[in-house]
């Protein structure tokens, strides 16, 4: 019998189906993912390919060697949007494994569809809260790197505390990084870039790779997104930060 989404590993999963409004149900914990209507195509792609491209939240660490079938380094990307740049990176770097987390279900569906189109096999995606995945599902030292590109800036000052880049988050990520693991962030909000730089620089377990001690030019290996290209044409800035674990 062909297994569909989330119907393969966890006894706590109640259903394998995504509904049209993006609701995802579990026996133990139910939550409504970020709003967004799944197209029939996206829902079918998720259900048909989740057994090979999807992972479910679990309370014990993932066995990445078993999941990917090799010992290549695992790069985690949090908040991959529609997933095009993540899939492109996985396609361009077959010597690395990629793990993407996104709570916007249409984005997950689009990412899976594009991965299938490109024939990518070194990518897995998760539809769950990133902090819980880091806490429960990833072993200490298991990651080769973390990518966080254009996270929600929460631009109002009173909402800055909601930004994902906080000292405790960085400490948690560092714990999951292996030796010489990296943290690569990018944002088009200068104020958020300054906060990222401040938080990362304050952690004594990290080294900034920038020659000037601040930002780096966009590296060639980070694909230029349509959103980013449009921003450049409008004169918007983009700031990349790349730190390495000591």
Curated annotation (Swiss-Prot):
Tagged with keyword Calcium: no
Binding sites annotated in the UniProt record for substrate: 156, 188, 225-228
Catalytic residue list: 152
Pfam families named in the record: Methyltransf_4 (PF02390)
One GO BP: tRNA methylation
Entry annotated with the keyword S-adenosyl-L-methionine: yes
This protein's name: tRNA (guanine-N(7)-)-methyltransferase
């Amino acid at each position: 019998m062909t297994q569909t989404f989330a119907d393969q590993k966890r006894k706590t999963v109640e259903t394998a189906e995504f509904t049209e409004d993006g609701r995802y149900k579990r026996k133990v914990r139910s939550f409504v993912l970020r709003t967004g209507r799944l197209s029939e195509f996206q829902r079918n792609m998720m259900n048909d390919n989740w057994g090979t491209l999807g992972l479910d939240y679990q309370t014990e660490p993932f066995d990445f060697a078993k999941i990917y079938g090799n010992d290549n380094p695992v790069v985690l990307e949090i908040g991959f949007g529609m997933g095009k740049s993540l899939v492109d990176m996985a396609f361009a770097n077959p010597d690395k494994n990629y793990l993407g987390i996104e709570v916007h279900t249409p984005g997950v569906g689009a990412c899976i569809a594009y991965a299938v189109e490109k024939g990518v096999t070194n990518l897995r995606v998760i539809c769950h809260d990133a902090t819980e995945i880091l806490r429960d599902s990833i072993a200490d030292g298991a990651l080769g790197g973390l990518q966080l590109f254009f996270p929600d800036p929460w631009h109002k000052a009173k909402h800055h505390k909601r930004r994902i880049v906080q000292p405790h988050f960085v400490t948690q990520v560092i714990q999951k990084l292996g030796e010489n693991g990296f943290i690569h962030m990018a944002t088009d909000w200068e104020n958020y870039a300054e906060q990222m730089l401040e938080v990362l620089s304050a952690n004594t377990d990290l080294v900034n790779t920038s020659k000037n001690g601040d930002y780096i030019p966009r590296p060639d290996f980070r694909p230029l997104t349509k959103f980013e290209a449009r921003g450049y044409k409008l004169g918007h800035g983009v700031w990349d930060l790349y730190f390495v674990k000591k």
